Amino acid sequence: MIEKVSSFLNEFKFEDIPKVAIDNSLRSFVDLIGVAASATQTDLSKIIRKHCKNFYAPNPNQGISSSIWFDGSNVNVLGATLANSMTIDSLDAHDGQKLTKGHVGCGLIPSIIACMEAEENYCSKDFLR
């Protein structure tokens, strides 16, 4: 089974994604960013952003950092992922509806963006893969 999944992932191309799936992904992404912007006003977001700025500083030897959204601060990849994910989750209005189980976009999207930002890789096709 794992061989089939691995083969599928290795052979899959961006061009194989149906337009409706891309459109839905982009709509969900915009929704998630809107939730993140609104959620910056929650107490949880303020606490976690302060925590990440204090304990997840970027490594000055590597020059690699990622941003805390709507804040202007840079931290390391883990700090950006943590701050942005928890900010989104603090409002609990993401992933389309409250009945959605798991809220996969809450952690996945901030993690992908933090990694892409740290690697200075801003390709939208890579983002959607």
Q: Where are the predicted features?
A:
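N-terminal core-entry segment
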Residues: 1-129
